[in-house]
């Protein structure tokens, strides 16, 4: 980890953050709910990324330790926060299991129709040495398809097969083995940052 909370805030990667109200991008920052169009902050290539300029990664959650191995965080996102409609109460529960796995569970309640897509930006350096990168880590992803993006990193709506592409991690493959290849999706995503 980093030495201070200020070091985390300075990172552009949402390092370790809970992401919301809406993880990923909303095209042109526009949503329509019940016939009403809402304009959200356009904080990333003209799109709304991770809930806007002041998404959940910039909010202070209330912490409740439920047991030695369980921490629950809660937050009330008020109606209109970052342009989103409805009061949204969300909870994130972090549990450390007996076999040393981290289990993250999300729940949310709202008082009106809205959008919500919570996620987490945890990153792990399994070497324990922050000066080393992860390019030699073997990665397996049990997925036959991915969602391509355009040059503004917005998903195109296509669901593309991974077979015969640099996105194919169905067999253990070093993360860095193909990351510098001339595959347009690696250029658009600045590496592997796709669904």
Task: Describe every region a protein language model picked out.
Residues 1-195:
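An exposed, glycine/acidic-rich loop-and-rim segment of catalytic or binding clefts
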